């Protein structure tokens, strides 16, 4: 198999970015720049690249094959134990950067790979805690914290973001709270693309209506927040009005930041 045949294979399996994905895949294994592929499109490639291309065509995300993903211009380690960082989530990190000042405390609930809290702490001299229920995901976050040299300013804690004395204490101490929680309806997950279904179900499943985490965070945690603190939540494409109504019932303000497609994506709660 060569570059041209890999592009053909990926295209036949409905991968829109076949050319770029093929070049990145090959570059990962042979250490050559992606441009090498165009100049050597018909050169036979080793079996390990062929096997990786077949996995990619079958629906395994490229990021899980290469073990890397980009977020806020930085490279992060990822594995099938964590969600793959997405461009729309950068709006959440950017919102945190606007609210977090030097010396403040940041709390990231459902931290996953740690890309949100790490990207913020790289840019603001503050401290923070990332909370994650999954031990394997927490190991990924620790590795990323080491890669990006965050040091003692970041604590990573294994706890249930929905039900933990540790979390309620952290909420009461934080100046800025961020979360990209699970928000997909349980019965929708199995209808999604193979790429999405490859991601950890624990990080996708937001309960029957996708609102489990928002209900807890907004109804209960906002009452614990100190004066002046803000909560920033990524929400699903069709959840903004329900989140707004939830904030109204809880007696807290709510505004939204739109994503690259003009969809309300980040709820600013406080």
Where is each model-derived feature located?
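Non-catalytic accessory regions of SAM-dependent methyltransferases
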Residues: 1-40
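Short helix-capping segments at alpha-helix termini
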Residues: 15, 124, 146-151, 224-227, ...
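Residue-level signal for inorganic ion chemistry
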Residues: 25, 59, 89, 116, ...
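Conserved AdoMet
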Residues: 27-98
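Conserved SAM/SAH cofactor-binding pocket of Class I
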Residues: 87-190
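Class I S-adenosyl-L-methionine
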Residues: 135-142, 146, 244, 248-251, ...
């Amino acid at each position: 198999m060569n570059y041209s045949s890999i592009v053909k294979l990926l295209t036949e399996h409905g991968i829109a970015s076949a050319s770029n994905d093929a070049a990145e895949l090959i570059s990962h294994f042979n250490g050559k720049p992606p441009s090498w592929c165009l100049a050597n499109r018909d050169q036979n490639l080793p079996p390990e690249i062929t096997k990786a291309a077949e996995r990619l065509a079958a629906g395994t995300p490229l990021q899980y094959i290469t073990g890397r993903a980009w977020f806020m211009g930085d490279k992060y380690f990822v594995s099938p134990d964590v969600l793959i960082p997405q461009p729309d989530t950068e709006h959440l990190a950017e919102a945190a950067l606007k609210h977090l000042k030097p010396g403040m405390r940041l709390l990231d609930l459902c931290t996953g790979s740690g890309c949100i809290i790490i990207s913020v702490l790289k840019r603001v001299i503050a401290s923070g805690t990332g909370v994650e229920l999954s031990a394997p995901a927490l190991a990924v976050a620790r590795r990323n914290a080491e890669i990006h040299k965050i040091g003692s300013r970041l604590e990573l804690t294994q706890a249930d973001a929905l039900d933990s004395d540790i979390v309620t204490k952290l909420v009461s101490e934080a100046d800025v709270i961020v979360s990209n929680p699970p928000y997909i309806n349980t019965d929708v997950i199995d209808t999604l693309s193979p790429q999405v279904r490859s991601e950890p179900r624990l990080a996708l499943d937001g309960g029957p209506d996708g609102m489990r985490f928002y209900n807890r965070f907004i109804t209960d945690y906002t009452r614990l927040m100190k004066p002046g603190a803000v909560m920033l939540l990524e929400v699903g494409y069709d959840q903004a009005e329900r989140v707004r109504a939830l904030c109204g019932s809880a007696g807290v303000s709510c505004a939204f930041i739109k994503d690259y497609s003009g969809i309300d994506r980040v709820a600013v709660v406080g």
